[in-house]
Amino acid sequence: KSCCKNTLGRNCYNTCRFMKKPRKTCSGLCGCKIS
């Protein structure tokens, strides 16, 4: 589960994951923390 600061971050993360990128990459890119 990703812990993003806001909806924008969550959308960013989901889009990134949809493009088959690693969780770590997406969380860093979108300012999210992996919990």
Curated annotation (Swiss-Prot):
GO terms for biological process: defense response to fungus; defense response to Gram-positive bacterium; symbiont-mediated cytolysis of host cell. The keyword Nucleus does not apply. It holds the Pfam family Thionin. Antimicrobial peptide disrupting membranes. Has antibacterial against Gram-positive bacteria S.aureus (MIC=6.5 uM) and B.subtilis (MIC=3.25 uM) but not against Gram-negative bacterium E.coli. Has antifungal activity against C.albicans (MIC=1.63 uM). One of its GO terms (molecular function) is toxin activity. This is Thionin NsW1. InterPro entries: Thionin (IPR001010), Thionin-like_sf (IPR036391). Signal peptide: none annotated. Its main location: secreted. Disulfide bonds join C4-C32, C12-C30, C16-C26. It is found in: Secreted. Keywords: Antibiotic, Antimicrobial, Cytolysis, Disulfide bond, Fungicide, Plant defense, Secreted, Toxin. It comes from Nigella sativa.
